Swiss-Prot record:
It comes from the Bacteria. This is Trigger factor. Transmembrane segments: none annotated. Coiled coil: none annotated. GO terms for molecular function: peptidyl-prolyl cis-trans isomerase activity; protein folding chaperone; ribosome binding. Residues 166-245 form the PPIase FKBP-type domain. Consists of 3 domains; the N-terminus binds the ribosome, the middle domain has PPIase activity, while the C-terminus has intrinsic chaperone activity on its own. One of its GO terms (cellular component) is cytoplasm. It comes from Pseudarthrobacter chlorophenolicus (strain ATCC 700700 / DSM 12829 / CIP 107037 / JCM 12360 / KCTC 9906 / NCIMB 13794 / A6) (Arthrobacter chlorophenolicus). It is found in: Cytoplasm.
Amino acid sequence: MKSAVENLTPTRVKLNVEVPFEELKPSIDSAYKTVASQIQVPGFRKGKVPAKLIDQRVGRGYVLETAINDGLNGWYQAAVQESGIRPLSRPEVEITEVPDPSATDGGLKFAAEVDVRPEIELPDYAGIKVEVAAAESSDADVDKALDELRGRFGTLKSVDRPAADGDFLTIDITATIDGEEVDSAAGLSYQVGAGTMLEGMDEAVTGLSADEDAIFDTTLVGGDHAGEAAQVKVAVKAVKERELPEANDDFAQLASEFDTLAELREDLAKQAAESKVVEQGVEARDKVLDKLVELVEVPVPDSVVEEQLEAHFKEGNGHGDGEHDTEEHREEVRANTARAFQNEIILDAIAEKEEVDVSQNELIDYIVTTASQYGMDPNQFAQIIDQSGQVPMMVSEVRRRKALAVVLGQATVTDSEGNAVDLSDFVRPGGEEEAPAAEVTEADTAEGEATEVPAEDEKAEAKA
């Protein structure tokens, strides 16, 4: 068998394949056996019909077609291995030449177009320079953390006054379009200033007391009329404020392992300082990755983006009722998917150059961490990803994280005040990031990996 690669674009190739008759013949012989088991000829047992009679009954052309269809994927896979290309999508195959049915020789020729991982040239990434915010925690950070802790133990009390920022309301809302009611809800709980409901809600309810209402214009975000302009009437049924427990030694004993408020504040200060270091590390990591993408040109196949785009909405990430399936959202998903693809290609190339490996313990640690983020039992989570064939994807993700950590370890990082930043607490000795913040591929989006198509999934099918 001969194969040759024709580069169509940086991310798409045409694989021209020639299969000589001697390599085609085993598939033809197998096709005769298959056809023989499917037809009945008087005087012959099923499966024992001679080839000449099969040619007379169904035609040698049908046998050749069966042989080609059965063997095509194997020849394509062999050509992929021989050429060294790394497919990203299913191939589009066109048969360009078949043996003459009236002859006993002649080869097969076909062309397969497929998207492939682009080849890139890595820059000198040692010593990349980035600047991050200074990691300074203050008494204000401690006060904020203490107030948040007090809030967990707070109680709600009805008040007879206008609603203010931070208050908790019980509300009824009714939406109308052109004077016709299109949606309504009663007894909703809402915190003023949360910004989690409708645009304009906070402004409308601020200053309202119980049994008062207001009307405001907004854009609906859910239901059959998502994205449409509407008038919304909001009626306040109750106004409540949260009473926080007094910050004293008794509260420290109630809310923590400490006996005194001073000990609790000291621990909160330590947590705030550690949090600032992690934030600094995450910022450095993201900026290093941004710099890598700036330095390397990575072409993105349209098919990869569109495939992930459709998967995103098909799997319900558009929230089921189409409320978020807007062109603006689609453009956001396209951009995120393209960026995730670029990140993957760059980090995979760095991992290959740095000969980054993933140990079993590193994979287990990552699975346990990911399981906790989903609130799942690690063993159950591991079983699910194993059954769904996602273990290789997990290995790739850990490998990329380690590759980025290698670059991060070589980067020159300073804060906004010109001080050198020590990231040793952020990067593990083995080269893996300590912080479990966002995935380095930033594929929020789900979007899945834009990696090579497994051999069993890239079956070649000829065009009709």
